[in-house]
Amino acid sequence: MPRTLIRVVFTLLLSLITGPAVAAPATLPTSQSAATKPASIDNAKTIQKKVASLGRRAIALLEKNKLAEAEPVLLEAIALDPLHTTNLYNYACLLALKGQQDDAVLYLQKAAEAGWTDFVHLNRDPDLKGLRDLPAFKKFLDQKPLYQKKSAERVIDSLKKQFGDDYLYELDAERKLIFATNTDKTTLSELKQWLTAQANSQWAQLFDHRLDHYVSVVVPSSEDYREIVKMPGVGGFYSDAAKLLICQRMGQTMTHEFTHALHAADMAAVGQEHPIWIAEGLASLFEAAQFKGDKLVPQDNFRLNMIQRSNRMRKLYPLAHLVEMKQPEFVKNATIAYGQAGSLMLYLYETNLLRSFYDTYKKTYDQDATGKLALETVTKQSLPEIDKAWNAWMMKRSPVPFSTGADGAVIGARLGDGNDGIRVEELVPGGPAEKAGMRDGDVVVGVADAQVRDYQSFVPLLIQFKPGDQVTLKIRRDGQYIDLPITLGKRSELPTTTRRR
C-alpha cells in the first residue's frame, strides 16, 4: 500500500472495528462504524459524515424519547449504510421501546451479524428490558460466541488489507485477542505468552471481570507506526471504543496499554468510567513490573526520578487536586501527573491496600467518583495525611538508574530500540560484545532468563551484574535465535564513543 495512504486508510480501519460505546447520560451507544465498502476514500468519508450526523441526530431525539421523530432518521442512516452496527443497534432499541419485540430482536441480530459485539452493554441496557424473557432474545444471546468470532474474523481481514502480507496475523479465540504484528513467529508467541500471563496475574490481583470482547493488538513496523501516530513521544495507545491496542514496540509500553484494556473491561462490566488518575495510575504502576513466578510484581519505573525532582522544586500537585483532574489538564501535565498517579498506586500496592482501595472505589463509585472517599476509607487518613505519607515514602525510594554507572557493567555496544527488542547499532572495537561474537544489526531480546524488549527494561536487568560476570544474552540474527555468552566489561575501561552500552 502507498505510504501516503496508510494513515487515511487506518482511520477507516479504526471506524470499521469500532463497536458501540456507552453514551452518557443516555442508554444508547454512540460510536460510529465505517460505511460499507467505499468506492474511494473521499466517497467513504462523505458517507461517514452523513451517517454520523444522522446517528447523532437520532440519539438526541431518542434521549428526549421522541421515538416517532427518531425512527425515520435512523432508517435513512441505515439505508445509507446497511451494515452500520450502532445505528442497527439503536434501531433495535427504538423498536423495543415501541413494543415491537420481534422486530427488535431481528435488528439486534442484524447488528450482531454486521459486527456489533458489545454484549456487556446489551445486558445492562434498560431499553431492552422488555425483550429479556423472550425465547428469541435468549436464543440470540446464546449465539454471542459465534457473533464475536465472526466479527473478529472480519477485523483480521481488515488488518490484512491495511498492513499486507509482511505481517503475522492470528486470532486467539480462547483469550479473545487478535494479533497483527511485524515480527517473527517466535516473537509473536512470546508476546502472547506475556499478555496471557499479565492478564491472569492482573485478574488475580485486581480486576474481577475478564475480557468479554476481542481486543486487537497491533505491533507495526517502525515505518508504519510513524505514519499512524504523528505525535512525537507517543509510544502506543489503547482505544476502548475500537477495542484496539497499538504499540510502537513491546516492553513497558505494551504492558501499560494492555493494562488499560483489562481495566476497561472491568469498568464496562460494572457500568463505570473511572477518572484518568486511576486509569493512568494503574497502567503506570505495572509498566516496569516483572514476574515472580506467576505474579506480575510492580516496581519503580523511570517516572520516579521525574517526580522526585519535581517535588524538590515544589511542583507536585496536591493529592486533592490530582484526584479531581480532568483528562485535558492531566495529559497536558503528563510528566508529573502520570508519575504521581503511578507512584501513589505503587504506595498502595506496597502497603497492601491496592486491592482494598480498588474494590472500595467501585463500591462507593456512586457516592464519589473521584476516589477521594475510597482513599480515605482504606487508609483511615484524610487526603492531606495520605499526601504527606506518600510523599515521604516516595522521596526515600532509590532513583531508577538510566545507566549502570561509571564503573558499572556494560556489553560494549551502542543500542537502539526496535519494535520487539534492543537493536545493536554499533560495537565498541575490542569490547565485550565484539569479543563474544555479537554483530551490528543483532537484536537483543533476553538477558539471562528474562525477556527484554526495550532499553528501559534492559538497564535494571544489567545493573544486577558486575564487570567480569558472564551473562547469556538471547539475540536474534537473520531470523535465527542465538544464546550468546558474554563477559561484561567496565564502562570506565571502554572508549567514550557511545550513548547506550
Residue ranges and their predicted role:
Residues 433-456:
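Conserved PDZ fold ligand-binding element
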Residues 159, 165-275, 286, 290, ...:
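Juxtacatalytic substrate-recognition/specificity segment
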Residues 229-238, 245, 269-395:
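Acidic/His/Gly-enriched intrinsically disordered linker/tail segments
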Residues 391-429, 434, 464, 485-501:
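PDZ/PDZ-like peptide-tail recognition elements
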